[in-house]
Amino acid sequence: MNKQRRSQLSEIVGNLEVLKEGLEELKEEERECFENLPESLQESEKGQQYEENADDLETACDDLENLIESIQEVINR
């Protein structure tokens, strides 16, 4: 791979890392909303929705991290 394509991939990795940080912040906000609910409301539909949203955002963050690692492997070859 030439220097220009490596540079383009590095820029993409940087953009993905910014997106991942944004998702992590939103995940934490959802998790805090859930944890700040009284216990009786945590088991309500709304509470379960907060928890499910946080879990799905965590999965998305993990997927993005895997993508970033895969691209970095290509850059480092």
Describe the residue ranges of each PLM region.
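Long, low-complexity or tandemly repetitive, helically biased scaffold regions used
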Residues: 1-77
